[in-house]
Amino acid sequence: MYKKVYVETTNNCNLNCDFCIHNERPKKFMNIDEFKTVLEKLKNHTKYLYLHVLGEPLIHPNINKFINIASSSFNVNLTTNGYLIKRIKENKNIRQINISLQSFDEKYQKSLQDYMNDIFLSVENLKNTAYISYRIWVKNKYTEEILNILSEKYNIMIDETKSKNITLEKNVFLSFNEEFTWPDLKNKEACKTGKCYALKDHIGILVDGTVVPCCLDSKGTIKLGNIFKSNIEDIINGKRYQNMLKGFSNNKKCEELCKKCNFIK
């Protein structure tokens, strides 16, 4: 059983951030029947769904329906850039919401204070039934301003040099991360050796049903199968899947994309 499965309900996004990898796949929204098919095939394979890979999940017109349907059998988690968080502020069927504060930029014609205030208003509702995790990069150009706003809101001194994970109040947390580079075949090779939690711990399902090893295969480079055409068991027993598993168990990266990934140690 997987610890979690990433399900991309859409690869559309309301932003165009410099740090995000460019989406080269056809833009699509998963429909309700497709989503139900994914859920049915994931039963007995995981208890935790993460409704994101590429794109902004809250842009999906049926996001609340998806959350409510999935919550009957799974613990639902999602990551959002925060701009559309009002759309789920009344939803009580979410286990955890990760808010990527590094997504803020003045080019989106909204002030930082207004952006944060909108998030705070929604978090006041959501924190009663969900864990809230603010995520921010240590060296983002707005980090200092954002931390000042958070510090004032939660009446707490925030020092990222002392702790990378801070409890702001009950069910509300702040995590610091370093900016990462999306693995891409165009990137310089990082290393040919290494082990990874992909396939053992988790898999990803793209909006068109393509099954990939992890949430960082945003382009669907390593196609292991398609959830709409095959069962999970058949995909797991597939040659490419098994070759990757065997490689990782021997500290070897079999796929070219994995060799370009800095997350694999």
Task: Describe each region flagged by the PLM.
Residues 30, 48-50, 90-235, 239-250, ...:
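Radical SAM enzyme [4Fe-4S]-AdoMet core and its adjacent flexible, acidic
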Residues 27-28, 70-72, 78, 119, ...:
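Alpha-helix boundary/interfacial micro-motifs
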Residues 55, 80-82, 103, 138, ...:
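Short, flexible loop/turn elements at secondary-structure junctions
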Residues 1-96, 108-113:
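Conserved alpha-helical substructure of the radical SAM core
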Residues 36, 64, 117-120, 233, ...:
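Generic alpha-helical structural signal
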Residues 1-26, 40, 189, 215, ...:
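N-terminal pre-core extensions flanking Radical SAM catalytic domains
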